[in-house]
Amino acid sequence: ASDEPALIVECLNGYRLKEQLPTNLGAFRTPIGKVETLVTGTDITIVSYGSTLRIIEDAIVDLERAGIAIELIDAQSLLPFDKDHDILKSVKKTSRLLVVDEDVPGGASAFILQQVLDEQHAWPYLDSKPQCLSAQPHRPAYGTDGDYFSKPSKDDVFDTVYKIMHESNPTTYPLFE
């Protein structure tokens, strides 16, 4: 417990998901400033948080079929951000970086990218341009398909990752037109 003020952001579309109740509910604590590696891989580091993690996990199944091994990292907190520089360690291993966020362009994904590139100095370890995949710069459409056309989808994640892989290895990952 702390007397320090805190802001917690909850993704509303996560409320609709059904999950098992954790057995350690009273004991579980998320350390502030620590990231969590959810999936280990060697080809590309994807950093995200909140409800987009499920979208990325769905895309990972298809990306693995395409021969791409994803390292998925949950940022968990922005201030402080990745105190142990675990994202930099991952980028050193994969040489590629994608930040996925359901917020508008220039939001949390831009902050995360700035922290990894400028504060953690990841530039020298990249084989391709680091990218952000965020929501479209418009108001979401109402209806059942509003999120699909406004926020990053499983298909968007797959396409973006595949293009990043193509950029550094076009022979192994040819573009399909």
Give short role names for the model-derived ranges.
Residues 1-4:
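Internal gly/pro-rich beta-alpha loop/helix module
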Residues 12-177:
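Thiamine diphosphate
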